[in-house]
């Protein structure tokens, strides 16, 4: 302040009144410009591409619009996905296996396309624009499905219409899944402790919002489809995604948008290509260079090769790009920051691979568990619960657990560990993986109990397979495994999203966050492969395959669940190997 006062006095003393006025105004404008620069978010703009300002853009208010939109978006998606097998088999003339394969392909494609949405948001557009375009595409697909369902035709043209609608929806869902979570997460200031805490809260409540949409989808919308007609169900989904757009736009004035920074895939391939080229060139050169004369010389060369610290082979391999930068062709020259970013991406990939088995468990329980419940007593008092409504149990449990975790468990963890996060992202993911092991063990025990009831009923009725009426065992036994799996999903999905977003370079955060959905897609695909492989192996030498028979009572489902439990345990050991060696790039302590 004293400096500015001295400058103004100097102007008044040595210049004319008119020139004094102009120079003082110029000085004031320079000060205003400096203030604006200091208050602007670096690398962020508002929806009109103007600099985003602190105190005006971002924060929990901006993220709250995203949470409401997620309720509507997931309602629109799951309302169809949860009951689509029944629609294809009863209305469109698909065989049970054909319907299941069609739904698996649709779900897997939708989740995989999240990678495309994340890539476009990082490279060329903002998450704001990707959401709006994706919502329009999903709305168009749902309109096609609504018209197709109203026609009730099984002609080939109707099936073409059906699949056009489904995959338009898949494309739209992929774009939304790839842009909406990072759009909400980027509203928080990661430079402050309060901003990081709010971002953690956001990811937990994102799962809560996702569960709210799922609850409405598997209850209200499924009831409409079963009792009023499928066009009503598709119509509700269409209305939900349409309403989500003005809700999303309502937050435009307070959003801050990350400026796209070019293709992260290009950077990834450029660095890897440069590393391979540098390694090849070094090997060619080493054939000419005289070898070390003494052991000390050799030790010195090894030290130079491992100058990247604790990264071992990865650090040595990618470090060549920096060390040999001047000798590389100009198109392959990379900055140290680019090499560092690629190193981070490679290090998070094993964590991503370790989560696929959990999602495979989710896929199995969403199919076989419903069939288990359909053979059991599904009455609660005078009310009969449809087996397709079983997903209500994990959804409701996740809705209860998410705020409990935020407001009770997390503060206790912070107090006991004296750290900002309380429980690290990798610990959250690991907790989810452990719960998935418990869920599969519980599923195996429940199926064993159910089979004992089947045997008892068969002996009492002198029949070989008791399946004509509900078994005298309540379906609530199956709900136990759903509770464990719902808990696993909450810990792992929220942990994955926050881990990938926080640890990924700022230039590829949307793409990295989309790995959470890609893991889900690979879990669905792997589940189909696993069932086929189990049936093939167990059916050798004229044995009965574990998962084939006239009905579920002839399956060896409990053996399959135990196999899943063992595989999940092995996968957890694989996860521990990588997680224990991972060094966070961000503040986790």
Curated annotation (Swiss-Prot):
Subcellular location per the Swiss-Prot or TrEMBL entry: Membrane
TM stretches of this protein: 59-79, 105-125, 127-147, 160-180, 201-221, 230-250, 344-364, 383-403, 429-449, 471-491, 520-540, 560-580
Broad class of the protein's primary localization: membrane
Top-level taxon: Eukaryota
Pfam families assigned: PTR2
Transmembrane helix recorded as keyword: yes
Any one GO CC term of the record: membrane
Membrane topology of this protein: Multi-pass membrane protein
Gene Ontology MF terms in the entry: transmembrane transporter activity
PANTHER family for this protein: OLIGOPEPTIDE TRANSPORTER-RELATED
Stated family: Belongs to the major facilitator superfamily. Proton-dependent oligopeptide transporter (POT/PTR) (TC 2.A.17) family.
Protein name stated in the entry: Protein NRT1/ PTR FAMILY 4.7
């Amino acid at each position: 302040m004293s400096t500015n006062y001295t400058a103004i006095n100097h102007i008044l003393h040595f210049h004319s009144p008119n020139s004094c006025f102009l120079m003082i105004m110029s000085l004031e404008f320079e000060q205003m410009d400096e203030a604006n620069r200091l208050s602007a978010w670096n690398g962020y703009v508002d929806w009109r591409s103007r600099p985003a300002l602190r105190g005006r853009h971002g924060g929990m208010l901006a993220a709250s619009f995203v949470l409401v939109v997620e309720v509507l978006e997931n309602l629109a998606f799951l309302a169809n996905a949860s009951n689509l097998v029944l629609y294809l088999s009863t209305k469109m003339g698909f065989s049970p296996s054909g319907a299941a394969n069609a739904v698996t392909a649709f779900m897997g494609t939708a989740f995989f396309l999240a990678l495309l949405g994340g890539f476009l948001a990082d490279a060329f557009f903002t998450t704001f624009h990707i959401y709006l375009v994706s919502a329009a595409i999903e709305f168009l697909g749902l309109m096609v499905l609504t018209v197709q369902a109203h026609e009730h035709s099984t002609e080939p043209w109707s099936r073409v219409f059906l699949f056009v609608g489904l995959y338009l929806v898949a494309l739209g869902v992929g774009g939304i899944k790839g842009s909406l979570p990072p759009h909400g997460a980027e509203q928080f200031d990661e430079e402050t402790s309060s901003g990081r805490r709010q971002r953690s809260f956001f990811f937990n409540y994102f799962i809560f919002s996702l569960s709210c949409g799922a609850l409405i989808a598997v209850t209200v919308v499924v009831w409409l489809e079963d009792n009023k007609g499928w066009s009503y169900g598709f119509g509700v989904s269409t209305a939900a995604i349409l309403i989500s757009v003005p809700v999303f736009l309502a937050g435009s004035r307070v959003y801050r948008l990350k400026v796209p920074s070019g293709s992260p895939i290009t950077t990834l391939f450029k660095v890897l290509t440069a590393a391979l080229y540098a390694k090849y060139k070094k090997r060619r050169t080493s054939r000419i260079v005289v070898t070390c004369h003494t052991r000390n010389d050799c030790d010195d060369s090894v030290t130079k090769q491992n100058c990247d610290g604790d990264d071992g082979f990865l650090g040595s391999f990618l470090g060549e790009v920096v060390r040999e930068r001047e000798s590389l062709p100009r198109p392959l020259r990379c900055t140290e920051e680019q090499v560092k970013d690629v190193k981070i991406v490679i290090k998070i990939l094993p964590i991503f691979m370790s989560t696929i088995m959990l999602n495979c468990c989710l896929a199995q329980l969403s199919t076989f568990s419903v069939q288990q419940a359909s053979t059991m007593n599904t009455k609660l008092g005078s009310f009969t619960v449809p087996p397709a409504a079983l997903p209500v149990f994990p959804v409701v449990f996740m809705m209860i657990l998410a705020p409990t975790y935020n407001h009770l468990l997390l503060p206790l963890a912070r107090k006991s560990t004296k750290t900002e996060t309380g429980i690290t992202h990798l610990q959250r993911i690991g907790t989810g993986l452990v719960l998935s092991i418990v869920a599969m063990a519980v599923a195996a025990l429940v199926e064993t109990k159910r089979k004992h009831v089947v045997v008892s009923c068969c002996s009492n009725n002198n029949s070989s397979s008791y399946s004509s009426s509900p078994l005298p065992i309540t379906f609530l036994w199956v709900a136990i495994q759903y509770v464990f799996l719902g808990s696993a999903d909450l810990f792992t999905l929220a942990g994955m999203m926050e881990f990938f977003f926080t640890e990924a370079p700022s230039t590829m955060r949307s793409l990295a966050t989309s790995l959470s959905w890609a893991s889900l897609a690979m879990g669905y695909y792997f589940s189909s492969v696993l069932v086929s492989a189990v049936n093939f192996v167990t059916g050798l030498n004229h044995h009965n395959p574990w998962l084939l028979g006239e009905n579920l009572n002839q399956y060896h489902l409990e053996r399959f669940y135990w196999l899943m439990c063992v595989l999940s345990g092995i996968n957890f050991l694989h996860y521990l190997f990588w997680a224990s060696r991972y060094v966070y790039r961000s503040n986790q302590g």
